[in-house]
Design a protein with these regions (language model features):
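Feature of Fe-S/electron-transfer and energy-metabolism proteins
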Residues: 1-314
């Protein structure tokens, strides 16, 4: 049934077994069992934003595609999926690449153990993500966006589809968006099937095309030969959400936050032996000591594992 059940205990498992044996319809199960908490502990620029749907897009459309892309370059925004590649540089390369079609792909295949920031953005800030995809489409000259949703996040699908339909009804997706002639853009959601490797962008594109999710030999890169062999920009959920802030407030505003080499803020998924696990948003440059103090792990911590099981211990 693709429903997520949280906060499992021995008692809850026993109760579930009885409901299953009794063939009790899922609709009659306690609905609190299916509640997935966002558990946001600290908000900053992104999680604390007050943008309304269409606000950032309207500014981008008024500025123009080339100027919007320049603001993204000026902002210093880097990919939030791990590689840290300059977003503006990627968008520019995709825009400049020849092709009959250009595509925007949102990588929502959040499979790294211990990471749940993208899930929170998709459940509580979906408008921001979809608007970021639309702005990216405008900047690179794409008419189609594809969100590749992790198979384990299928329970989010209905709400995400409802958000997309609302945006279409509001004129924020579809034909001649916000009355701009020639700017047509829409978004489809594709479900993954649980393969960890599909978090890698070329394997993700293979999966989108209906093939086995295996990484491609590179070069060529997706920005020139991506989805269906066409120029494609693949960006992380958080990257696209942050692009909305850049579009709305400008590159210089965003670049002034964080550090000289890493602009803006970052969402951190904090879990393990701490009193307050959850999502924390900080400007780049924060020290580990402050993070430990904020999450309630400052007194007895011996090591901090960074980047999940495949990362390192500090």
């Amino acid at each position: 049934n693709y429903r997520a059940v949280t906060r499992m205990t021995a008692q809850r498992v026993a109760e579930m077994v009885e409901l299953i044996r009794g063939e009790t319809p899922l609709a009659q199960w306690p609905q609190e069992w299916f509640a997935v908490a966002d558990n946001i502990r600290r908000k900053d620029l992104l999680l604390g934003n007050t943008l309304v749907p269409g606000e950032a897009l309207e500014v981008a459309l008024a500025r123009g595609a080339a100027a919007t892309l320049e603001e993204v370059r000026r902002s210093g925004l880097r990919g939030r999926g791990g590689a840290g590649f300059a977003t503006g540089q990627k968008w520019q390369a995709c825009r400049d690449a020849p092709g009959a079609m250009h595509y925007v792909v949102c990588n929502a295949d959040e499979g790294e153990p211990g990471t749940f920031k993208d899930r929170v953005l998709l459940s509580a800030y979906a408008d921001l993500v979809f608007e970021g995809m639309t702005i990216a489409g405008y900047a690179i000259g794409a008419a189609q966006g594809l969100l590749y949703l992790r198979g384990e996040y299928r329970y989010l699908l209905e709400a995400l589809e409802q958000t997309l339909q609302r945006r279409r009804n509001q004129g924020l997706l579809g034909v001649e968006i916000m009355g701009v002639k020639g700017f047509d853009f829409d978004i489809e959601i594709h479900l993954g099937a649980g393969a960890y490797i599909c978090g890698e962008e070329s394997a993700l594109i293979e999966s989108l095309e209906g093939k086995a999710g295996r990484p491609r030999i590179r070069p060529p890169f997706p920005v020139t030969h991506g989805y269906l062999g066409q120029p494609t920009t693949v960006n992380n959920v958080e990257t696209l959400a942050a692009a909305c802030l850049v579009a709305r407030h400008g590159g210089a505003w965003y670049a002034a936050i964080g550090t000289a080499k890493s602009a803006g803020t970052k969402l951190l998924s904090i879990s393990g032996d701490c009193q307050r696990p959850g999502i924390y948003e900080y400007p780049f440059g924060i020290g580990v000591a402050q993070l430990l103090a904020d999450c309630g792990a400052a007194s007895s911590t011996q090591a901090v594992q960074v980047s999940g099981p495949s990362g390192v211990c500090l």
